[in-house]
A protein has these predicted regions:
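Structured alpha/beta or helical-core interaction and ligand-binding surfaces enriched in interleaved
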Residues: 1-173
Length: 173
């Protein structure tokens, strides 16, 4: 199910059960803990122009519906604040299934392999991390606001690292 809400920075592709409160960070039918997400969860990155990604989303939606791909999101606009001129599609999965997901992606002409773990992503969004700092630069925040954003990001992300046995909870985006 493609969710294209213009108020969101992203277009999402979810299984309908996710909209009923189910998690998409699941492996073999079991919701993942924070430690499992840090160890196994990640995403394939696919770069492209928005119209091409919209077409690709239509083709990948059935794989999400069949639970072969857990979730996909992609940029509504290129993330210029991160130095990119193309949109990024993030095709999420457990690394133990990433080869199968990669085979699906290659059916649609995707050749560039770029895998990023959720741990790496979280580290880049921690206080001082490159993604958080670039994003704040693009927002033009004053130092007091930057400090508050860093504190909030640190609290959210540190919680995942500090509570390994809790069921992982995603953040609203």
């Amino acid at each position: 199910m493609i969710i294209d809400d213009p108020r969101s920075k992203f277009v999402f592709i979810y299984h309908p059960l996710v909209l009923m409160g189910r998690s998409y960070t699941v492996y073999q039918g079991k919701e993942m803990t924070n430690s499992e997400v840090l160890e196994y969860w990640g995403k394939w990155l696919v770069l492209g122009e928005r119209p091409w990604l919209d077409d690709l989303a239509e083709k990948l939606d059935p794989y999400v519906e069949r639970k072969e791909i857990p979730v996909i999101k992609y940029d509504r606009l290129p993330p210029l604040n991160l130095g990119l001129e193309e949109c990024v599609m993030m095709v999420y999965c457990d690394r133990r299934n990433r080869d199968e997901v990669w085979k699906i992606l290659t059916r649609f002409g995707i050749k560039m392999k770029a895998w990023v773990t959720e741990r790496e992503t979280m580290e880049m969004w921690m206080p001082g991390g490159i993604l958080l700092e670039r994003w704040m630069d693009s927002q033009g925040y004053d130092e007091a606001t930057r400090d508050a954003v860093r504190e909030d990001a640190g609290r959210r992300i540190t919680h995942v690292f500090d509570h390994p046995e809790e069921t992982y909870k995603t953040w609203e985006q």
